From Swiss-Prot:
One of its GO terms (cellular component) is mitochondrial matrix. Belongs to the ArgJ family. Heterodimer of an alpha and a beta chain. It comes from Debaryomyces hansenii (strain ATCC 36239 / CBS 767 / BCRC 21394 / JCM 1990 / NBRC 0083 / IGC 2968) (Yeast). The record marks 137-138 as: Involved in the stabilization of negative charge on the oxyanion by the formation of the oxyanion hole. The active site is at residue 214. This is Arginine biosynthesis bifunctional protein ArgJ, mitochondrial. Its EC number is 2.3.1.35, 2.3.1.1. GO terms for biological process: L-arginine biosynthetic process; ornithine biosynthetic process.
């Protein structure tokens, strides 16, 4: 990542992020191996740029994936989505990822390169054809240095995979581009008398806007779950996590979120039938919370960001309307720059609410709308607007609330609908311009 023009204070802040958010250890699912190496995609000659994750359990795994909605879908997105669709999520065991080049808008050669990455990975791991999915991230419009990648895959698969914390960190680092720290989360949970484990990695710092953008994420579990149930759970979880974040309002060509389950920890199969309803609900809750934790790390690492902002919309007529309103605020450059400047300009919040494209005119009633800042120290909320009437705001307290890293804005629509949504974003700073102005240099 280029740091030209970024001051010493900002560099210290970025380093502090890494120390706070990169785990010193973790718990990892049974039956998976991961790793990352430098194969030559990145120009500096040393940064990790090739990652593999694979199922080593005796039985084949199941997978689900959610892909970008951008019309210019990158070659790896097209190839991987076809495999998931044709195999209905069954017998997908591995992921291969390169960073530094997106393999997007690269024509027929890009499609061939993406398929070749899968073919060589399957061969190196001893898996049947099309048992892997492929991801790429980086600069758009350049062909991959494919010979370097195809030479690197057997090297990585042949002796550089493992299940230690270091292996998982290497894998997380190998998918980064402008990220200032690798994003890795893991946890264990109890279900039906068994202990199951989740581990996840994500990449993203810029071009983050629903529905996903320059965002790669994958998480795996050793819980036993059917392909159809995993697909339903992933879509629910993604809608409330990776599709509920925004950094800069740009949507990428390469977004991919993948979940893989191998059942290595044993137990009864969890599916989406009535007999599994309770177990399905618990697993969905665990995966959704886990996905939110991983997605929030992407926002915390937003390019140039100094603030982590939670937007809570309450008492909406529907979850969909609550999310539309929250997204409208999160993508407002005026709102984001106000947060950077510790400016309690709630008029910008109302403006974004007012132009949001909600499904019904009844969803927003100016005379019932309430806006507040929720302090991170647990003290009483600072009311800015109550039932459409402005409050006399203590500007000093408002500035103090906005001066810390974690900020929450609460919007109570007062419709009585009871639906709510949380959405996460960051501020917009001078450093964002510097980073993106230097991206290809």
């Amino acid at each position: 990542m280029q740091l030209n023009g970024i001051g010493k204070h900002s560099i210290r802040f970025l380093s502090d992020k890494a120390s706070r958010f990169v785990p010193k250890g973790g718990v990892y699912p049974k039956g998976f191996m991961v790793g990352g190496i430098h194969c030559g995609v990145k120009k500096d000659g040393k940064s990790l740029d090739l990652a593999i994750l694979t199922n080593t359990h005796g039985k084949s795994a199941v997978a689900s994936a959610v892909f970008t909605t951008n019309k210019f879908k990158a070659a790896p997105v097209q190839v991987s989505s076809k495999i998931v669709k044709e195999k209905k999520g069954e017998e997908i065991n591995s992921l291969v990822v390169n960073s530094g080049n997106a393999n997007a808008v690269t024509g027929s050669q890009g499609m061939k390169d993406a398929q070749d990455m899968i073919t060589v990975t399957d061969s190196a791991l001893g898996n049947p054809t099309n048992s892997s999915l492929v991801m790429s991230t980086g600069v758009i419009g350049n062909n991959l240095p494919i010979s370097k990648i195809l030479s690197g895959i057997p090297q990585l698969a042949g002796g550089n995979l493992g299940n230690t914390h270091e292996d998982w960190l290497n894998c997380a680092q190998a998918i980064c581009t402008t990220d200032t720290f690798p994003k890795l989360v893991s946890k264990s949970f109890e279900l039906n008398g068994h202990t199951y484990t989740l581990a996840g990695l994500a990449k993203g710092a810029g071009m983050i806007c629903p529905n996903m953008a320059t965002l790669l994420g994958f998480f795996v579990t050793d819980a036993p779950v059917s392909a159809s149930a995993l697909d339903q759970i992933l879509k629910f979880a993604t809608d409330r996590s990776f599709n509920s974040i925004s950094v800069d309002g740009d949507m990428s060509t390469n977004d991919t979120i993948v979940a893989i389950a191998n059942g290595a920890a044993g137990g009864e199969l969890i599916d989406n039938t009535a007999s599994s309803a309770e177990s399905f609900g618990i697993l969905q809750r665990e995966i959704t919370g886990f996905a939110q934790q991983l997605a929030q790390l992407v926002v915390r690492d937003g390019e140039g960001a100094t603030k982590f902002i939670t937007i809570s919309v309450k008492n909406a007529l529907s979850y969909g309307d609550a999310k539309i309103i929250a997204s409208s605020i999160a993508n407002s450059s005026l709102f984001k720059t106000a947060m950077y400047g510790n400016d309690a300009n709630w008029g910008r919040i109302l403006c974004a609410i007012g132009y949001s494209q909600v499904s019904s005119g009844d969803s927003i009633n100016p005379a019932k709308t309430n806006v507040s800042f929720i302090p991170s120290d647990g003290s009483s909320k600072l009311k800015l607007l109550v039932n459409g009437e402005p409050e006399v705001v203590d500007e000093k307290r408002a500035s103090e609330i906005l001066s810390v890293e974690d900020i929450e804005v609460e919007i109570d629509l007062g419709t009585g609908g009871g639906q709510e949504c949380k959405f996460w974003t960051c501020d917009l700073t001078h450093e964002y311009i510097t980073i993106n102005g230097d991206y290809r240099s």
